[in-house]
Amino acid sequence: MTARSILQEDFDSGVKEATAWALGYIARHNKTLAQAIVDAGAVPLLVLALQEPELCLKQISASALFDISKHNIDLAETVVDAGAIPFLAKALSNPDTKLKRQVLLALSSIAKHSVHLAEPIIEAEIFPDVLVHMAHPDECVVKAAAMLTREICKHTLELAQLIVNIGGIGALVELISTSKLTVRLPAIMAIGYIAGHLDQLAIAVIGSKGIVHLSTILYEENDDHTLAVTVWAIGQIGKHTSEHAKAVAVANILPKLLQLYNNPNSSEDLKAKCNTALKQILQKCMYIEALESLLHDSPPNILKYVLGQFSKILPHDPRARRLFVTSGGLKKVQEIQADPGSTLLEYIQIINCCFPDEIVRYYSPGYPNSLLEAVEQYQPKCPSLFAIEEHLSSDIDSKSSLSSFNEEEKEEHVRKLC
C-alpha cells in the first residue's frame, strides 16, 4: 500500500502521522527526492492532513510541506497551488508551540523564493500576528517568525513598506535587543533588507535605535557569521545619504569595521562585508571627525574613499581645513605613498591645493631635516668682531669729545656772565 493511499483512506491517525513523517524525511534531503514525493501526488494529501483534528498530524504535515517547498520555486509553487497557505495561516492561531513553529517555517520556505509566492502569504492576513509571535515565550517560534518577516520584506519595497506600516521595525529592533544570538540573526537581516530598499525606511530604522543595537552587537560578539550579517545590515542603513552615514559614524562603528577588516583572524566573508560596508558608508560620509579616525590605519583600498571625502569637504570649509591641520591629518596625507596616476594621488593633490605651499612643505616628510641641513650650510653674513670693536671705540671717542666741548662751552659762558 502506498503512502498516498494511506493518507487518503480512513486509517488510524498514528499510521497517517508516521506516513507524513516518512514523506517529510524523504523530501528534506534534496530537490530530486522532494520532486519524487510531489510526483507521487502526496502534496494535496498533506494539505488534507493539515485539516485533520489531530494536533500531531497537523504538526507533521506542516513540517513535511516545509521539507518539500524549501528546495526550489517549482516545488514551493506546487505547495501553494495545492491550497496550503490558507490552512497554514489558520493553523498559526492554534496555541500549540510546535505547530506554530512548523507553520511559520513552512510559510518562510514558500515566501523566500519570489515575490509571486510571498504575496499570497500577505493576502492570507497573518500579519501583524506574525510580529506578535516575535515576543512568544518559545525562542524557536520567535526565530521562525523573524525568518518569515525577513523572507517577506526582502523582495520589494512595497512588501517591506507593508511590514514597516504594521510596526515591523519596532518588533524587529526589540527582538535584536533582547534575544539570544541565534534568534536575532534573521531579525538583523530583516532590518538590513528593510533599510536597503529606501532611504526613508533606513531613517525609520535609525529612529528606532536600530543602529545603536547593531553597534552593540558589533562590539560584543565574536562569531564571524553574526558579525558579517551585522556589518551587512549596517552598510544597508548607511549607504543612502550623508545623514545616514553620519548616524553610523556617530555610533563609532567605522573604526570597528576597519579593525575587523584589518584583523588577520577575520573570515574572508567578514572581510568582504566590511570592505563593502566601508565603501558604501564612506562615499556618503561628510563627518570629518569620523573620517580623520580612519586616516592612520586604513589600507590604500579604503584610504582612497576617506581622502575622496576630504577632497570634497576641505575646499569649502575653513573650519575643517584648520581642524585637518591641527589634528595631524595634513601631516598624515604627506606621508602617504601613492602610485603615479592613481585615484589616491589625485585626491592627495586636491587636498594639498587647499593649503598654502609653505604649510604643505612644513608637514612633508623630511622637512625638519632639510631645515637642519640648511642651517649647517648657511654662511653667516655678520660684520667682523674687529669692525664691531672699532665702531664701539669710535663711538666712545665721539661721546668723550662732545663732553669736553660741552665743559669748555660752560666755562666760557660763566666768564661772560662775570
Model-identified regions with their sequence ranges:
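Recurring C-terminal helix/loop segment of individual leucine-rich repeat
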Residues: 32-35, 74-77, 116-119, 158-161, ...
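Eukaryotic intrinsically disordered, low-complexity regulatory tails and linkers enriched
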Residues: 362-418
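Alpha-helical solenoid repeats of the armadillo/HEAT superfamily
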Residues: 11-27, 39, 53-70, 81-82, ...
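Eukaryotic helix-linker segments that join adjacent hydrophobic helices
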Residues: 1-5, 15-17, 21, 44
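Eukaryotic alpha-helical solenoid repeat scaffolds
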Residues: 286-288
